[in-house]
Amino acid sequence: KWALGIALVAVAGFTSCSDQPDAYETTGGTPSISYIRLADAASKDSLLTGAFQNTPICIVGNNLRSIVAMNFNDRPATLNTSYMTDNTILLTVPKDIPDVVTDKIYMITTSNDTVTYDFKVLINPPSVLSMENEQAKAGEEGVIKGNYFLDYPDFPLTVEFPNNYVLPREYIKSITMTEIRFTVPEDAPAGFIKVKTKYGTTRSNFQFHDQRGILFDFDTPNPVTNVVLGNHGWHAQKIQEDETSLSGKYLLLGDVDMTADGAWNDGNFSFEYWAGDWNGGFSGDGVKLSDIVDFTDFENMSLKFEMCIPENGAWAAAPMQIIFAGPDKVTISTANNVFFHADDGWGRAIYAPWKDSGSYNTGGKWVTVTLALGGDQGVFNKYWDGTAASVKPSKPEDFASLTIFCVNAGGYIGEDCHPIIKIDNIRAVPNK
């Protein structure tokens, strides 16, 4: 019986082999490529001489089952024999950036020969997304963030400021795929920054040392009424200058204990600029912010400011509610603390960088915070309790006044802390 069982297994094994006449087998000889197209059959007439990383392609040729490995430049492609025939190979262009660019495909055969075919792996031009501190001073470290920051010995990456000022190479401290660290030079002009690589040049959407759309820098008279704007509400938060200043005076919120539930403490955590004067107008230090900055295209604008939080003043509770409002909601003469949590569900941004990590500080450095006012990335869409807002700012005059209040009304429970939050250069600027 045992012998019969073994014999039956052996027969079954041979039967299973003979039942797979289409099993993949490699061939000998030399492969050749006739052309390459997109893998999508609907695009079969689109012949390619190059493709971006991670693009599905179809290689058409002869004797392609003689290929056992394939490299694009110096990066291997994944070959799936289920998608390989004598005449076609379906594969995806490798996603990794090549170290050595030759603009060739290398086909390694069953006989360990290498056959080449001219084909470019197209690499995206650099993406320049943000600067850690747009107001970084000369001698300080600047950090540009983005992607595809590719630096080659034969084509070094360059950073260009306005007026054709190219950052000297010796000022660049390090380059990774997503970050450029450099020492800010004394004579770098303010404005848009360009990053150039072998694969293209991209201009930033932000400006270095941006002075557009300033609402509060706590030092400079506004251009409409020639008055320095600051506290203009119920509370007089500290506006001060010291050795930690970014540039002149800054606004200080906190520097007192805050409970984990983010309890109401407007005396220490609420900055109010409520437009208006006591005569029913908007003169002097009560000018409407919407008269200082043009908010007509607010859907394509962002609120920005620089913020500094020391390690010994980490922020771990009470999200920052940033609330714009029109004269119909609040002025200095109609001052109230109801408009921003009334039943109409008025929208605002709720900023809580500590929420996921449990605690947040900037290590005593100044960093730029960017909050989109509108559009797909707009964040001024939350109500007082963190739910979706029913009504959002919809016209320029809705940006006449500004309240910044660190307080929790639901969903933002943190940890007991003693936050020290320094803010400067509050501005509203175009996204591009």
Predicted feature locations:
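Beta-strand acidic-aromatic groove motif in beta-rich domains, primarily in extracellular
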Residues: 312-336
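Extra-cytoplasmic beta-strand recognition segments
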Residues: 218, 289-320, 371, 426
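C-terminal motif of bacterial Sec signal peptides marking the signal peptidase cleavage site
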Residues: 13-16
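Extracellular beta-strand elements of beta-rich domains used
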Residues: 421-428
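Short carbohydrate-recognition loop motifs
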Residues: 237-284
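Extracellular carbohydrate recognition and processing domains
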Residues: 335-392
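Extracellular beta-strand ligand-recognition surfaces/modules
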Residues: 304-305, 319-321, 368-420
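Beta-strand/beta-sandwich contexts
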Residues: 18-65, 112-155, 188-190, 199-226
